[in-house]
Amino acid sequence: MPRIKVFTRRQFAASAVSIAALAALPARSMANTSTQATGGNQMTTLTPYLLFDGNCHQAMEFYKSCFGGELTSMKVKDSPAKDHMPAVQQEKTINARLKSGSVEISASDWLRLDRPRIPGNTACLYLSGGTPQELKALFEKLSEEAEVHDPLKETFFGIYGALNDKFGVRWMFQAAKNS
């Protein structure tokens, strides 16, 4: 069974309220950085992931001014995906991560031209880290009666997939590539 970082109801609610009231990646890679070592094992973490309409960088800078911490961010034009994205998307943020103590927020600009950005699909639960096998097992369990948007597959930044579960909750999954 995979190890999942669990927040108390109070911690999760405080994070959600803070984010609502206010409105992760190294520069060279989109590899998972939220994996924590636990006795030689990797732990899967659960992080809020916010999607913005072209102002992700400004929003994350604002959150940094509130929470402090370290902000890492990458634009489409600086990523390996640049050749696969239209010119209109090049200045948008493909991924950002703010880490300040126990507060972690991941985000990007809305990059799906094939799906509209509407209230309800601009935030999701982001499972990252662990092993690809653990992530696959969780993806399969949550896929029951789900709407799968992106099947789990290898990408330039690791294993990735996304779905809306049978209750309408949006989930994103990411693990580092196998070495």
Residue ranges: model-predicted function:
Residues 27-44:
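C-terminal segment of N-terminal export signals and the immediately downstream linker at the start
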Residues 4-13, 27-32:
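Twin-arginine (Tat) signal peptide motif
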